[in-house]
Swiss-Prot record:
Disulfide bonds: none annotated. Residues 196-229 are annotated as: Disordered. One of its GO terms (molecular function) is zinc ion binding. It comes from Mus musculus. A zinc finger (PHD-type) spans 307-354. The keyword Coiled coil applies. This is PHD finger protein 21B. SMART domains: PHD.
Length: 487
């Protein structure tokens, strides 16, 4: 009684949360549900004929017409408070205690999906045929692994639980069991057990000798993995907002993989790097820029055998091997030459040119074209900037040389000026000396002319007169006679 009250409360709660839009969608997909009913019968199916009184809620739904359909709300079918325990977890030595089963019946003959909004009718079964079920088949399908509705089969205490030999329903005494249901056009509720092989609709009414499989066969069927779901069935489930557990895990794993790749790929995570790192001169030496063949790890294809001679000068000793080919080079043979050996993976100029040539032939589309054009534009601008900086450095060196030459010329001019000043001073001194000498010569010449005039005017000879001491003028004239002749 407690389980019955719980099922009724659950039906009321589900009826309260019905949505008109979902009803309309389910009504639109009703033909597809009927078409897929044959393909959804996986495994052994058992048909349950309509027995017992009809359910009142189903009668109300049938009276409303085909436009009003119950809503499939799989999230609230089984509350967390209800225990779900497989019957095979029971200890093997414990005698099985069978209880009264519950049969779901429907009045509407048209193919439809039973939902949790339909109430469950408890149909007592006779206890005289206890041999029909030796052990309950406890197959509980997960909520998210089937594309059909589920029926809640409740149990109540009883001594045994059997149905007619031609129709059997898997029942367990541990609690609530969930089975996917399909309703065929002949007023039968088909309880589907997931299995690998797909059986046609004609297998819904098997012969009596083959309807009671053994415990070993049932255990074997339970242990077999489920087959791949039908794509149309999965599409229908996605339209209703239902996904299987495997599909959900696959979606989450793909999402995590995309996130991991987008964050771990250095070719796309370095878009916000500095301009220096995006230059062609910097990313050419980056091994990630090379092709997949050039960047291939040597451990996958074996160790690379490098040449014993330099590829440029054809001589050996102290070679730098290339990380992507068999070539080796001297550090001094490279253009430009290297002073210290590079650390890590080093790529020779030949492989760099090959990678650049191959990269230029790849067409760029979309965002890659924008990024490529931006990088190309920045590269051209950087090259122009480098040229201007180089020209500026050359002009600056020329300016320094001219300044040095100017300083040298200034010092030379200063020395010339000093020499000129000294020469002018010496010239002035010499000129003054010459002026004095000329004055002296004029005096001497005047004195001589005076003596000649006196000699011509006086008839008496000089010896006749008294002897006098010669004057200083005469003495100086005789002294300066030799310098005057020299000049």
């Amino acid at each position: 009684m407690e389980l019955q009250s719980r099922s009724e409360a659950l039906a009321v709660e589900l009826a309260r949360h019905q949505n008109g839009d979902l009803k309309k969608q389910l009504h639109e997909r009703q033909p597809r549900i009927a078409a897929l009913s044959d393909k959804q019968a996986l495994g052994s199916t058992t048909a349950v004929p309509v027995t017992g009184p009809q359910v009142s809620s189903l009668q109300r739904l049938a009276g409303q017409g085909a436009a009003v359909l119950p809503q499939v709300r799989p999230k609230t079918l089984i509350p967390d408070s209800l225990p779900v325990t497989p019957g095979r977890d029971r200890p093997p030595k414990q005698p099985p205690t069978f209880q009264k089963a519950t049969v779901v019946s429907i009045k509407n003959p048209s193919p439809a999906l039973p939902t949790a909004n339909n109430t469950v009718n408890h149909v007592p079964t006779p206890s005289s045929q206890t041999q029909a079920l030796t052990e309950p088949t406890a197959i509980t399908s997960p909520l998210s692994s089937a594309g059909v509705a589920y029926a809640i089969i409740s149990t109540s205490p009883s001594n045994a639980a059997t149905i007619t030999p031609s129709t059997t329903v898997p029942v367990a005494s541990d609690g609530i069991k969930v089975q996917p249901l399909l309703i065929s056009a002949d007023k039968k509720v088909i309880i589907i057990q997931p299995q690998v092989k797909t059986q046609p609709e004609s297998s819904a009414e098997p012969e009596p000798p083959t309807e009671e499989p053994s415990q070993g066969a049932q255990a074997t069927k339970e242990d077999q993995p489920p087959s791949k779901e039908n794509p149309e069935k999965i599409a229908f489930m996605v339209a209703l907002g239902l996904v299987t557990t495997e599909h959900l895990e696959e979606i989450q794993s793909k999402r995590q993989e995309r996130k991991r790749r987008s964050t771990a790929n250095p070719a796309y995570s370095g878009f916000l790097e500095t301009e220096r790192k995006r230059l062609a001169s910097s990313y050419l030496h980056n091994p990630l820029f090379l092709t997949a063949r050039a960047n291939e790890d040597p451990c996958w294809k074996g160790e690379i055998t490098h040449d014993e001679f330099c590829a440029a000068c054809k001589r050996g000793a102290s070679l730098q091997p290339c990380g992507t080919c068999s070539g080796a080079y001297h550090l001094s043979c490279l253009d430009p030459p290297l002073k210290t050996p590079p650390k890590g993976l080093w790529v020779c100029p030949k492989c760099q040119r090959k990678a650049l040539k191959k990269d230029e032939g790849v067409p760029w589309t979309g965002m890659l074209a924008i990024v490529h054009s931006y990088v190309t534009h920045k590269t051209v601008k950087e090259e122009e900037k480098q040229k201007l900086l180089q020209r500026g450095s050359e002009l600056q060196s020329e300016h320094q040389q001219l300044e040095e030459r100017d300083r040298q010329l200034a010092s030379a001019v200063k020395k010339c000026l000093e020499l000129k000043t000294s020469l002018l001073a010496r010239q002035r001194g010499t000129q003054s000396s010459l002026d004095r000498i000329r004055a002296l010569l004029r005096l001497i010449q005047g004195e001589q002319m005076l003596q000649v005039a006196m000699a011509t005017t006086s008839p008496t000879p000089l010896l006749a007169g008294p002897w006098t001491k010669p004057s200083t003028t005469t003495t100086m004239r005789t002294t300066l006679q030799h310098p005057q002749n020299h000049n």
